[in-house]
Amino acid sequence: MKKRIKELTDLLNRYRYDYYTKDAPSVSDSDYDKLYRELVTLEQSYPEYVLQDSPTQQVGGTILKGFEKYRHQYPLFSLQDAFSREELDAFDKRVKAEFPNATYLAELKIDGLSISLSYENGFLQVGATRGDGNIGENITENIKKIKDIPHQLSEPLTITVRGEAYMSRQSFKAINEARQENGETEFANPRNAAAGTLRQLDTAVVAKRQLATFLYQEASPTARNQQNEVLAELADLGFSVNPYYQLTSSMDEIWDFIKTIEAKRDQLAYDIDGVVIKVNSLAMQEELGFTVKAPRWAIAYKFPAEEKEAEILSVDWTVGRTGVVTPTANLTPVQLAGTTVSRATLHNVDYIAEKDIRIGDTVIVYKAGDIIPAVLNVVMSKRNQQEVMLIPKLCPSCGSELVHFEDEVALRCINPLCPSLIQRSLEHFASRDAMNITGLGPAIVEKLFLAGFVHDVADIYQLTKENFMQLDGIKEKSADKLLAAIEASKSNSAEKLLFGLGIRHIGSKVSRLILEVYGDISALLTAKEEEIARIDGLGSTIAQSLTQYFEQKTAAILVDELKTAGVNMHYSGQKVNSDAALFGLTVVLTGKLNQLNRNEAKDKLEALGAKVTGSVSKKTDLVIAGSDAGSKLEKAKSLGIRIEDEDWLRQL
């Protein structure tokens, strides 16, 4: 189970990167959801194997170059997904267990891009993207070009609101027609078009593309008591609010609303991919709280995927940076969710074997939420027995023999000198989440590798202007920019370097957790496995992988070469203080705080070494209870958990 959890974590994180960061989804929503739900089930059964970089512990995407970073005062969370009436009933049961009289507000789930708008004294100050939920991109100038976003509110309020920016189907059609006439690549769907538009550096382009918005939340403290009152206030302030919402008291009413909306979905002027159900009482919302990733007071019902038939013409096999060989099917073109689809993932050889997929087969292709599709299964009634599937025995890149380990689902090339493996490793090292070497993408990495200028990541820091000038298509100005980006990467905080090394199981968040404790890459050369395993959020698998990597002589040589080249080895963030007053404690906040707001209290607790969670359990060490604390306080008492008040926290 441990290995399957790791496989799912790695796969889903790659899909998340493609979806949130590149705005180029590589798997359908429905397929992603199926894998995600499998991971959730396994993690619930084996909580000791949950990895720090698991997508169940994360929110959103990563930060793109070109706009300033913006730290959200109020974090943006994702929503728990539901795909059936039974899952909605289970959500209702959990809520009603604490609040028997709870009512719900059902709203449309707009398929766009999450935005946050901050106003001071009624004037728009900042418009930002979600980013990773804590840090987004400041896109204020582009936000100001969206006609239905007020620059000044009808009242002089200081307020932060949330919503969705989207592109109407009519605008999307017009833009793609124009792009086709100009010989430009068409957008895959309205969501991608909206995302690309908001990241435009030319604000005139943003204005021309006619984005629109629906606002649905006050993130800052509000005087309203109910979610439907929040929507009414947002409309009064001049924001666009979606007119399709319904106050309900039962799941029967919600299910009727879902079916009504699903029936008229195609008649709407914009794309939706589901219905969001929220506890209407804001006081109940606060008491229910959050998981690491999502609020406990809301759930998103997602519509079933659209399905079409297509024929598999051929299969491409590509090698990733860890040696995993991934199959992609080339299909007869088919119209699916408004776009032409000609490629779909086949995941791995085990998936192909399980579904008995062959070249020449007619298959069911599905795509939820306008995302690039995957193959669901084979239409066996259309098979004529002439179909074949040739599973490669040799690496498509280097020609060495592929292996299929018993505990893995994929074929793997284990040749350390495989050109594709080396190139993917170099690309990973230069990528945004790693060393963020702007401009050093796959095309240039390939040219550098084929020219013999780079063989490992340390070689990047030995490149000269002359090296770049020898490459086809690289002019002096481009060479100067690349060298400047390489030089700038030397000053990155060490967790980016650790992630960039591409060690198995060591994601970006895990890298930060490790460096928060060790502070320096060099210290990892002698770190003990049992010490690493004790770091909160890690475990034996990560610890073993890290120590095995740094026990290699080649790792010590590589670190020395990078250090000699001037690459920073130190962690620039705040190191964990094991002497902090609440170090290692799991703490829950409940009730109304009078002096501190929730974020201030959470920040203080984390600064004192605590891990703040949203629910009380046997693993909880401490509960900070404000006034009007409800069921969480009672549960803490029943479990004999230590309870303190706000004054106690303020005095620490």
Curated annotation (Swiss-Prot):
NCBIfam families xrefs: dnlj, PRK07956.1
GO MF annotation list: DNA binding; DNA ligase (NAD+) activity; metal ion binding
UniProt-recorded name of the protein: DNA ligase
Cofactor: Mg(2+); Mn(2+)
Family of this protein: Belongs to the NAD-dependent DNA ligase family. LigA subfamily.
Regions annotated as coiled coil: none
SUPFAM superfamilies reported for this sequence: BRCT domain, DNA ligase/mRNA capping enzyme, catalytic domain, Nucleic acid-binding proteins, RuvA domain 2-like
Keywords: DNA damage, DNA repair, DNA replication, Ligase, Magnesium, Manganese, Metal-binding, NAD, Zinc
Alphabetized InterPro entries for the sequence: BRCT_dom, BRCT_dom_sf, DisA/LigA_HHH, DNA_ligase, DNA_ligase_AS, DNA_ligase_CS, DNAligase_adenylation, DNAligase_N
Protein EC: 6.5.1.2
Function (record text): DNA ligase that catalyzes the formation of phosphodiester linkages between 5'-phosphoryl and 3'-hydroxyl groups in double-stranded DNA using NAD as a coenzyme and as the energy source for the reaction. It is essential for DNA replication and repair of damaged DNA.
Catalytic residue list: 109
PANTHER family: CHROMOSOME TRANSMISSION FIDELITY FACTOR 18 (PTHR23389), DNA LIGASE (PTHR23389:SF9)
An annotated GO cellular component: cytosol
GO biological process per UniProt: DNA repair; DNA replication
Source species, domain of life: Bacteria
Organism: Streptococcus pyogenes serotype M4 (strain MGAS10750)
Residues binding Zn(2+): 395, 398, 413, 418
Keyword hit for Electron transport: no
Binding site for NAD(+): 29-33, 78-79, 107, 130, 164, 278, 302
Catalytic activity of the protein: NAD(+) + (deoxyribonucleotide)n-3'-hydroxyl + 5'-phospho-(deoxyribonucleotide)m = (deoxyribonucleotide)n+m + AMP + beta-nicotinamide D-nucleotide
Domain BRCT intervals: 577-652
